[in-house]
Amino acid sequence: MKFAVIVLPGSNCDIDMFHAVKDELGEEVEYVWHEETSLDGFDGVLIPGGFSYGDYLRCGAIARFANIMPAVKKAAAEGKPVLGVCNGFQILQELGLLPGAMRRNKDLKFICRPVELIVQNGGTLFTSSYEKGQSITIPVAHGEGNFYCDDETLERLKENNQIAFTYGGDINGSVSGIAGVVNEKGNVLGMMPHPERAVDELLGSADGLTLFRSIVKNWRETHVATA
């Protein structure tokens, strides 16, 4: 399986994402600069965290206009796995690929520490190697990770089982404790916690590696079945 790690001005987690895929999983991965216009030849797309374009106007608001973004939307429409982490999640919201918006954390402080997540949906291509209800430890690093949506959208997320992860406690004020959501097709995931920073027990947790393994496992099963 071949992954693309999108690199934007201000990305700062692209190297961690690359390491998780290449060094921990042993899969193919390439950096793709934001000025590129095609993602043909890639099987999965990873949008890392950071502060794209300095978070000016609004987190992800300028990044949505990057040359590569139409190709990201095309990959999502084709059913390829697309993962956006932290700022990547915000960008996916700005692109309209995921619902909701991000507000400042409730205490207006930047949070940077390991947190407990609860797996709410173990049936997606990103979470199938977890158990529903499983408690995992993944670090967060954000100042604007307070997920917000209106009541109608929240009800739809619950009905469609689109809530992938919730926080084990109220760390930032997110509606219903939401930490990550998938689109209706289940091939686009946005999450504020950083799974790429939890791929080695030396760092305190390897729970994030399971997410990447899930992606690869599902891709291989699908492609072997259709070969």
Curated annotation (Swiss-Prot):
GO biological process: 'de novo' IMP biosynthetic process
UniProt key word Transcription: no
GO molecular function terms attached to this record: ATP binding; glutaminase activity; phosphoribosylformylglycinamidine synthase activity
Keyword Hydrolase part of the UniProt annotation: yes
Pathway: Purine metabolism; IMP biosynthesis via de novo pathway; 5-amino-1-(5-phospho-D-ribosyl)imidazole from N(2)-formyl-N(1)-(5-phospho-D-ribosyl)glycinamide: step 1/2
Subunit and interaction comment: Part of the FGAM synthase complex composed of 1 PurL, 1 PurQ and 2 PurS subunits.
Name the UniProt record assigns to this protein: Phosphoribosylformylglycinamidine synthase subunit PurQ
Organism: Bacillus velezensis (strain DSM 23117 / BGSC 10A6 / LMG 26770 / FZB42) (Bacillus amyloliquefaciens subsp. plantarum)
Lineage: Bacteria, Bacillati, Bacillota, Bacilli, Bacillales
Designated gene of the protein: purQ
